[in-house]
Swiss-Prot record:
The keyword Secreted does not apply. One of its GO terms (cellular component) is cytosol. This is tRNA (guanine-N(1)-)-methyltransferase. Keywords: Cytoplasm, Methyltransferase, S-adenosyl-L-methionine, Transferase, tRNA processing. One of its GO terms (molecular function) is tRNA (guanine(37)-N1)-methyltransferase activity.
Length: 250
């Protein structure tokens, strides 16, 4: 899968995209990340890619012309489905369902908003899919692009060393992940649950499902409102509710 990222600050991506899972995926040719410096598409000697807003106000606005040239150039080199995504606080909040949907395309063209945002004509010309990573303020769309690329890349076959990791991640199946443990068995009088040491894979799987439902019920009950549960999951959820009530009463 290809990611074309239009940005004023390509150096912001060096660390996140050259290490860990993303770095390995790039080395193996599973994903390709193309960083496009918007300033390379300016025409004046100062490489001006932003300007003061009409009507006054604080901050600067990213100019439409260099973004148009950069995006048009990228599109001319790509074949297939390449939706244009604008990282913006005004966009749809990124969640796992959206991540899965985005991963089905041949690639994505990402525009990283910065300063006070992009000239409105970028939206009018390209009608991008606007995506936000949450209701809070960060330095620029570059941070959102890093999150999006990481999340989408995990959906691509072969990127994860063990495909089970993808399925067991929080949110992949609409609920939170179950608790994880490793050695030692006991630390500061805190013990690993006996079931995980039993070797009984059926019991372990059942325990993990119930713990995932229990954790979701405690921390993110909203996720369960529209979640379609299997009969087994419904039974485990009732058991989890009883356990929570018992812990509360104790």
């Amino acid at each position: 899968m290809n990611f074309d990222i239009l940005t004023l600050f390509p150096e912001m991506f060096d660390g996140p995209f050259n290490n860990s899972i993303i770095g390995k995926a790039r080395d193996r040719g599973l994903i390709d990340i193309n960083l496009i410096d918007i300033r390379d598409y300016t025409t004046d000697k100062h490489n001006t890619a932003d300007d003061y807003p009409y009507g006054g106000g604080a901050g600067m606005v990213m100019k439409v012309e260099p973004i148009y040239r950069a995006l048009t150039d990228v599109r001319s080199k790509r074949k297939g489905e390449y939706p244009v995504v604008l990282l913006s606080p005004q966009g749809k909040t990124l969640d796992q369902n959206l991540v899965k949907s985005l991963s089905k395309h041949d690639g994505l063209i990402l525009i990283c908003g910065h300063y006070e945002g992009v000239d409105e004509r970028v939206r009018q010309i390209f009608s991008p899919l606007e995506i936000s990573i949450g209701d809070y303020v960060v330095t620029g769309g570059e941070i959102g692009a890093i999150v999006l690329v990481d999340a989408v890349s995990r959906m691509i076959p072969g990127v994860l060393g063990d495909e089970r990791s993808k399925v067991e991640d929080s949110f992949y199946n609409g609920i939170l992940d179950y608790p994880h443990y490793t050695r030692p068995r006991v630390y500061q009088n805190l013990k690993v649950p006996d079931v995980l040491l039993s070797g009984n894979h059926g019991l372990i799987e059942k325990w993990r499902k119930k713990q995932a439902l229990k954790r979701t019920l405690i921390r993110r009950p909203d996720l369960l409102k529209n979640k379609k549960l299997t009969p087994e999951e419904e039974e485990l959820l009732e058991e989890a509710k009883a356990e929570i009530e018992g812990e509360y009463n104790d």
